[in-house]
């Protein structure tokens, strides 16, 4: 006997439908665990708003009511991200025959102001990089991570996920698995290469304490000692050394990635080249950094032009 589509007599719970959708994304697109969990959270929040009712019974009016309820406390960027997740979910449900129509079809993204990434000056970056105590193994690890991120522009998740096999020290290149499981080759400079060699020649083994792993950057914290650094751990590293360097401006885990892109553009790098280095699928994402670079050029003009 043919089974009726879910959402009409709902033989499958909404929890299971979210799981099935997440499994499909993982199998077909190889999205990262962090991305998949973010999708799950957004869908579960919609379920909570609907008091646990099946998402397959959700109509356009229900979605409009959800976004209206969220409007006062949610940024446009967050609302648009959630709408993107919902559109993907309902397109999947339609494709699988679970619903007859896509309730997101007529919904449009909210207008949002251009958010320019916060960046550090070159002097601030130098102070940040010099902050770790490199007479210790932990300090060498931290200095190496900071140097490599500034030299390569990696995402934090890409940095902490690096394996020793991803390193090409002979030609100073990293093999990185980025968003959507897309692999790219990322060059880095001689200074970062020297710190990597110093870290690998002694500090890493000291931190591992006899353990074996192919994770490049390892932690010494409690029960996780000898395992890979997490994004949260690296964020704590950045905040710790920013404080030591006297940096009081607002920071984010990607501060050095933003500085990498901005400083390249300030020194005349081609926008397309920066796009490839950052691993952006769309150049419009990279274009945001040109606004930071223009601000810097305007400051230089005002400071040095005789009629500035």
Features from the language model and the residues they span:
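Conserved catalytic core of the tyrosine transesterase superfamily
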Residues: 1-308
